[in-house]
C-alpha cells in the first residue's frame, strides 16, 4: 500500500482508499485515530485517558480512550481533537481530564481564554452560564456519568401544541390524541429584532391560534434553532440583535410562556427534534440526524429511546485532520463539520470544481445554481456531490466513536435532488469498501412523506409527559 505524508508532523498514514475528487488531502479522523491507537498498542505504551464533561444540573458525560503518556505531537493532536469533538457533541462548562499530567498541562493552555481554543471556552461559558474550567485528575477520579435520559417524545395523549422556530418562519400544530387538527406556518424575522417582546408575542399568538382549535391545552412542546439548555435559549441567531441588558429576558421566553399557560412545557434544540421525528416515523431508536442546510445541524436519540440533552452542535466538531483544511471564520478552527456538510461546503468546493458564479450570489442561491447544473448533467457539479458523499462515508464511522447509533437520517437542502442521490451512493461505497465491519450496522434514511407530514412541530408536541 502506498503511504502519503499527510500532516505537518509527518505522521505516515495509509491514504483513504477512496479519494475525494475535489479535496485530495482530506484526512479522515477515523483513519488517523485508529492508526494512532494501533501504534501505541503495538509499542506497549498505551495508558488510559478518561474525559468527563460536566454540564447543567450536575449532568456529566464520560469518554474513555487510550494515549501515549508522553506529550509527542501525535498524542497532543489526538487528544486535543477528541476534546474539541466532545465539547461540541456533549457540551459542558467543566472538563475533568483523567490522564497524563504533561498532556493536561499542555491542553489546559489551549483550552483557556488566552489559548487557541478561546472561542470554544467562551461559547461553553455562555451556553452553561459558568466560567469554563479544565481540571486534571487520575483516570479513576473522573466522576461517574450522569445523563438526563429524557424519554424521547411519542407522548400523544391529550390536547397538545407543538411549535418549531426557524430563522425565517415558525410552525405551530395542534394535536389531539395523536391526530393533527391544525397546523400553520408563519413568516417572521427574529434576527433583527432588538425587543424581546417580539419573540414573546409571536410565539404566544401562535399558541393561542392553535389552542382555539381544541377544548383545552394539556401540554406544549417546542423545537428551536440554537443552544437550548434547561428550557432557556443560551446561544441563538434568533436573538442575535437583542441588546445585552435585555438578553436574560429574551432567553427566558419559554419559561415566561409556561407561567402564562401553567401546563407541562418542554423545548429542545431542533436537531434533537429532527432525530425524534425520524425515530417516531421509522419506529426505531439509535438515530443520529444530520441536517445539511445553511450550516450542519445534528440530533441524537439513543438506543433506549432517550434524548440525552447533549449539545450536538456538530457544525463545530472536527471531521478533517488535514492541517491545511479550510478554516471556519467564526471559530477560527480548521476542519469543522459545517465546512463539509452544509451550503458552506458547496461554496468551498466551487473553485476546485472550476465553477464560477457571480460574487453577489448568497449561499442558498449558489446551491440553486449548482442544482440547475446537475439537472443539465454538468460533470463539474457532480464532483461536488461526490466529494461531500466521500466526506460523509468517512465521517459516519468517526461519529460512531462518539454516538452509538444504528440509523442515520440525512436531510437538508444540500441532500435534495439528483445531487443528494450521489451523496448517499458515495457514502455507501466508502462504507462498503473501507469499513465493511460498520456498513451493515448503519442504515441511512432520507425523510419520507410520512416523516415530512409528521414534521418538527408535531414531534415537538409529543415531548412533555402529562401529569397524572
Language model: regions and residue ranges:
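Short glycine-rich phosphate-binding loop at a beta-alpha junction
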Residues: 89-99, 216-225, 403-414
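Conserved glycine-rich phosphate/nucleotide-binding loop
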Residues: 435-468
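Glycine-rich phosphate-binding loop and adjoining helix at the ATP-binding site
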Residues: 68-80, 84-90, 101-138, 186-203, ...
Amino acid at each position: 500500500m502506498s503511504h502519503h505524508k499527510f500532516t505537518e508532523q509527518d505522521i505516515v498514514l495509509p491514504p483513504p482508499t477512496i479519494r475525494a475528487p475535489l479535496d485530495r488531502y482530506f484526512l479522515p479522523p477515523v483513519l488517523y485515530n485508529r492508526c494512532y491507537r494501533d501504534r501505541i498498542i503495538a509499542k506497549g505504551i498505551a495508558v488510559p485517558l478518561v474525559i468527563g464533561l460536566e454540564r447543567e444540573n450536575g449532568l456529566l458525560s464520560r469518554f474513555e480512550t487510550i494515549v501515549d503518556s508522553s506529550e509527542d505531537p501525535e498524542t497532543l493532536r489526538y487528544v486535543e481533537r477528541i476534546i474539541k469533538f466532545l465539547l461540541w457533541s456533549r457540551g459542558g462548562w467543566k472538563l475533568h481530564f483523567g490522564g497524563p499530567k504533561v498532556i493536561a498541562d499542555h491542553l489546559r493552555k489551549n483550552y483557556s481564554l488566552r489559548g487557541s481554543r478561546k472561542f470554544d471556552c467562551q461559547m461553553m461559558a455562555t451556553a452553561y452560564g459558568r466560567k469554563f474550567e479544565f481540571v486534571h485528575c487520575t483516570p479513576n477520579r473522573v466522576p461517574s456519568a450522569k445523563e438526563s435520559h429524557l424519554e424521547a417524545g411519542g407522548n400523544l395523549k391529550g390536547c397538545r401544541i407543538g411549535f418549531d422556530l426557524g430563522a425565517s418562519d415558525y410552525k405551530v400544530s395542534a394535536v389531539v390524541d395523536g391526530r393533527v387538527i391544525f397546523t400553520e406556518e408563519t413568516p417572521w424575522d427574529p434576527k433583527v429584532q432588538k425587543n424581546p417582546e417580539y419573540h414573546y408575542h409571536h410565539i404566544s399568538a401562535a399558541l393561542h391560534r392553535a389552542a382555539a382549535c381544541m377544548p383545552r391545552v394539556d401540554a406544549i412542546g417546542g423545537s428551536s434553532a440554537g443552544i437550548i439548555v434547561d428550557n432557556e435559549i443560551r446561544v441563538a441567531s434568533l436573538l442575535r440583535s437583542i441588546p445585552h441588558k435585555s438578553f436574560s429576558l429574551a432567553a427566558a421566553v419559554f419559561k415566561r410562556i409556561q407561567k402564562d399557560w401553567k401546563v407541562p412545557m418542554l423545548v429542545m434544540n431542533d436537531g434533537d427534534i429532527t432525530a425524534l421525528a425520524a425515530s417516531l416515523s421509522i419506529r426505531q431508536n439509535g438515530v443520529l440526524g444530520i441536517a445539511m442546510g445553511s450550516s450542519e445541524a445534528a440530533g441524537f436519540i439513543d438506543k433506549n429511546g432517550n434524548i440525552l440533552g447533549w449539545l450536538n452542535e456538530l457544525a463545530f466538531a472536527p471531521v478533517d485532520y488535514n492541517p491545511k483544511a479550510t478554516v471556519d471564520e467564526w471559530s477560527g478552527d480548521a476542519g469543522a463539520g459545517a465546512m463539509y456538510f452544509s451550503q458552506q461546503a458547496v461554496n468551498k468546493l466551487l473553485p476546485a470544481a472550476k465553477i464560477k458564479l457571480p460574487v453577489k450570489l448568497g449561499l442558498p442561491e449558489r446551491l440553486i445554481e449548482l442544482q440547475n447544473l446537475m439537472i443539465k448533467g454538468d460533470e463539474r457539479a457532480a464532483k461536488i456531490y461526490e466529494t461531500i458523499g466521500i466526506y460523509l462515508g468517512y465521517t459516519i464511522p468517526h461519529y460512531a466513536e462518539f454516538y452509538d447509533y444504528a440509523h442515520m437520517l440525512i436531510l437538508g437542502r444540500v441532500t435534495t435532488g439528483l445531487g443528494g442521490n450521489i451523496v448517499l451512493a458515495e457514502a455507501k461505497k466508502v462504507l462498503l469498501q473501507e469499513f465493511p465491519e460498520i456498513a451493515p450496522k448503519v442504515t441511512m434514511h432520507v425523510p419520507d412523506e410520512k416523516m415530512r407530514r409528521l414534521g418538527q412541530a408535531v414531534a415537538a408536541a409529543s415531548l412533555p409527559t402529562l401529569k397524572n
